[in-house]
Amino acid sequence: MTAMDVEAPILCAQTTVIDARTVGESFIRLVVAGAELARWSAEVVDAGTVRDAYVKLIIPPPGGGGVVPDPAAIRDWLALPESERGWMRTYTVRRADTVVLDGAQVPALTIDMVVHPGDDEGPGSSWARSVAVGDELHIVGPGRGHAPWAAWAPGQAGRIVCAGDETAAPALLAIAEELAAEPSSAREISIVIEVPTEADVRALSDGAPEFVTLVARTAVAGEEVIRRLAGILDVGEESIGSVMGGQRPAADRDREWHPASEVSDGDPYVFLAGESGLIKAMRRLTVDAAGIAKGSVAFMGYWRRGAAES
């Protein structure tokens, strides 16, 4: 790659919604495409798996419109009223493809958006319910020649364990597809995802590799995925009760977010993603109860219950 091929580190691309459909009961799957995506990092937009790469969607205010941000002057954009500029929200890319749009071959990204009910519904969820094919959407992401915004780094780990909630489902399912495609992999792989309903389990299980387990939420959010994770890690029942009753993250920490250190060949690698309170509980289970070294654990707090995120 020459200097001429390297774009700015952060770019804002105009895209068009070319498909929008409901998946299960809790997800809306969007496919967006546009020529400007061709200037993005190859590890985000080139056809194939995308691991846990995430992008920033510019959610327009009610009635449409909004202000397109200049990545070089993002503070100016953030200073505008939300009712004028809209909102910036983070989503993981589920899949990258190419499609024909307006007679030209262009990149396309599939993004699964969780629609939270009631008080947990934010502007992204509300917008997703009303989006239509043909709508425009601006997306911010890394420019070509730059690394994707992602944390997945298992190295040559001999054992991989992943766990998360519905917001982690797109990343974990993309990761599962990448792992399943590895030639003659000798890794021991376990992935468990808690989703809101049985309908979500059925919809997301379709085509998922056999080492992926999807479970429906019980009355207590996070309880089922923690129980399944404890089983995978061979941790006793008393530890489950302990982490479920643990304190929430300290008030001055918006999210739990820590990539793993470099993983040595054959070591275990644990990847935890989802709501920050859940992540803290699963991290305690993994490190304190199961005794896995902190450097082998990546934990990504994608959101925090009751708090806005941009």
Positions of the model-derived regions?
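Extended, composition-driven regions rather than compact fold-specific motifs
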Residues: 1-310
